[in-house]
């Protein structure tokens, strides 16, 4: 049986509606003396202002949402550095070493910065009780649940209700011979008696970590007074929407917020965000397919499969898994009241008239999580009621679209600070928000938090012939290649260029430019052998690669007429798996001469030469590495876009960059999207073997940077990956006669964080590190801005040291991490993360997107994936 979203039936709830304990947006009763206004609460729901569908259903899986149940999971919300969405902190993962009195460094120029945080000056001093609320017969609509419960506000007192859980300042005594503390009765509009049964779950003290769950609920209740609309997880302001009519989309500005305990104070983190809301519906996409394609069904299906859509009538999002062309809005499904057609259902429930009665239905299948929670029915959705969200690949590839969006989304620091202060002012001036915060004795500071910070000493970039460039605030040394040679060159004597015959002249001109450019950098590139192909079919490219690889070239350059994902995938599969050889793929559009910008082609040639040198184990530049015998490791994960059950974990390690420019890399496939790699210890053993073969010894120290950690996985990383890795390393080192074991530091690197900080009204310069105030007391962590941006606000990167016995202090770890952001050879400047992290990302992305299998081991010592 296939159902529409939120049908009136006990099973088959809307996708993603497995109740959880932190759905802060699900309607709140007046709290602690707040003036009651039931019409306002219901009115918001009717308008969709309180998101998540004021009609989501509740079922037997609800017990899992209690605080006591959550505590069983060692979850930290989002290990990327913030509490994402409605997930709140329960058990914390402590990474700060016992006895560590200070994790702050002292090296560098001391400055003061502002951050996008506000102090919580006052907070409640209470014990609050949590209850679970059940309705008999079951009431699916959350807005009705709120309304029915609100009728008993006199008995309940001040409370917060999210549709499932009620937080209340009153403790109700247990009823004898009953699991419930309160059993209330109310009447529906039809005159039916509705029993409301309230069961005690637990309590939260003002000193408990769970208090932040309640504080975030209260904050979201206060934000409701700002006339914001909840879409998915965050609140957005439709009144301030920005219409991009030429691109059929709107940008809704919004806020991502989180209250939690930081180093010394409880702070509210507030970040400005934007939601892309397309003005077209799935029906518009269907109409375009019918108009433009002979096989409209296949075209429409390709366009919408995997798309996330928004249904305005219940403000919920769904992922499209299939299209049922055999079903129409006239089809019927079963409810508790009997069968009903989709047309009649939407008319009766939402007063919506379906106009096209022949349109197909799109399907959203339940996830494994939904099924475990009892949501085992597919959801059927009417195309004309489903609005497309997000951006298509075509939009992302359209420079005009991106430029139009960036004018509004890439806020400079001064505009971002102004918006943050305006948000704070609205919270402190809106009557409903003020009453909500005041009733719970919560007060926010008006000023952004000020933080002590430091600017680390600038790095020295080492080139050939002992030339040195001291990196400045631009964090870019591209121009230095005009006068400097690369640190270590690999001369190219045997190489092939595969090009379509009709484009031979343009290809030869570009190759000659590369040869001249290399010569100016003291790198010798001989003339290549040209392998002309009569056409650009995949099979033709494959045959040409086979012909070239048979002659053992150092590298193969392949020219494509235009970007083509399928063709690129074919080339990379051939050169990375079937006939392993380093390859450099270029497109004619990039390498063809341009009259308008002749110097631009020289810049492209320079970048290509640098890439080719790096792929052949050369070193375009170097930084000063103070430690001998240091192996740095990067690990990242990329999910396969073609198979959601597959992901690829890439492992990249250096072989002591002070003495060697070889790398070790490998990729493992993982099933069911799991971002934890059981193969990590095996990969590490292989990397150590490669290191031993080159140096006749094991590394003195290992610095491991772990990227790709998803929500709530920090506990698993600490207790499975790190512990397994340490055990394996100790075993290897002790078997080699090193009884003290391995000295390793393991750092979680997180880019997707909401923290921002500013120097005055400007971006902080590269090397600005923050290790106080907004860091977390349970962590050994710091924030680092390593890159420079020209437009918008720079994003810091979070470093969480979860294991450390290298014997280096905070200063040295921070400076080492900063050094490693200078070593990415695909860009002559600093990047957001240590280079090995980005190398791992590039490799995982290449395999997930193009190769779909493990590359040949014959390439594992080269940066062939650049």
UniProtKB/Swiss-Prot annotation:
> What is this protein identified as?
Protein aubergine
- A Pfam match: PAZ
What's the Enzyme Commission number for this chain?
A: 3.1.26.-
Q: Which residues carry this modification: N-acetylmethionine?
A: 1
Disordered as annotated region, ranges: 1-61
What are the PAZ domain coordinates in residue numbering?
281-390
Listed under subunit, the entry gives: Component of the ping-pong piRNA processing (4P) complex consisting of krimp, aub and AGO3. Interacts (via N-terminus when symmetrically dimethylated on arginine residues) with krimp (via tudor domain); this interaction requires methylation of at least one N-terminal arginie residue. Interacts with vas and AGO3. May form part of a piRNA processing complex consisting of tud, aub and AGO3. Interacts (when symmetrically dimethylated on arginine residues) with tud; methylation and/or interaction requires association with piRNA.
Compartments annotated for it: namely: Cytoplasm; Cytoplasm, Cytosol; Cytoplasm, Perinuclear region; Cytoplasm, Cytoplasmic ribonucleoprotein granule
Organism (species): Drosophila melanogaster (Fruit fly)
Domain Piwi per the UniProt entry, residue ranges: 555-852
Q: What is the lineage of its organism?
A: Eukaryota, Metazoa, Ecdysozoa, Arthropoda, Hexapoda
**From start to end residue, where is composition biased (Gly residues)?**
46-56
The molecular function GO annotations come to: mRNA binding; piRNA binding; RNA endonuclease activity; RNA endonuclease activity, producing 5'-phosphomonoesters
Q: Which superkingdom is the protein from?
A: Eukaryota
- Keywords, in A-Z order: Acetylation, Cytoplasm, Developmental protein, Differentiation, Hydrolase, Methylation, Oogenesis, RNA-binding, RNA-mediated gene silencing, Spermatogenesis, Translation regulation
Member of which family? Belongs to the argonaute family. Piwi subfamily.
Q: Which InterPro entries match?
A: PAZ_dom, PAZ_dom_sf, Piwi, RNaseH-like_sf, RNaseH_sf
What role does it play? Component of the perinuclear meiotic nuage, a germline-specific subcellular membraneless ribonucleoprotein compartment involved in production of transposable element-repressing Piwi-interacting RNA (piRNA)-induced silencing complexes (piRISCs), which are essential for maintaining germline integrity during oogenesis; essential for the formation and/or structural integrity of nuage particles.
- On this chain, the residues bearing Symmetric dimethylarginine are 11, 13, 15, 17
The UniProt entry lists the main location of this chain as cytoplasm
Query: Which GO terms fall under biological process for this protein?
Result: defense response to Gram-negative bacterium; dorsal appendage formation; global gene silencing by mRNA cleavage; heterochromatin formation; maintenance of pole plasm mRNA location; maternal mRNA clearance; mitotic chromosome condensation; oocyte karyosome formation
The record's account of how the chain is modified after translation: Symmetrical dimethylation of arginines (sDMA) on Arg-11, Arg-13 and/or Arg-15 by csul/PRMT5/DART5, is required for binding to tud, localization to the pole plasm and association with the correct piRNAs. SDMA on Arg-11, Arg-13, Arg-15 and/or Arg-17 is required for binding to krimp and stable recruitment to subregions of the nuage. Methylation state does not affect protein stability. SDMA plays an important role in ping-pong amplification of piRNAs and is essential for function in vivo. Methylation state functions as an indicator of its piRNA binding state.
One GO cellular component term, please give it.
cytosol
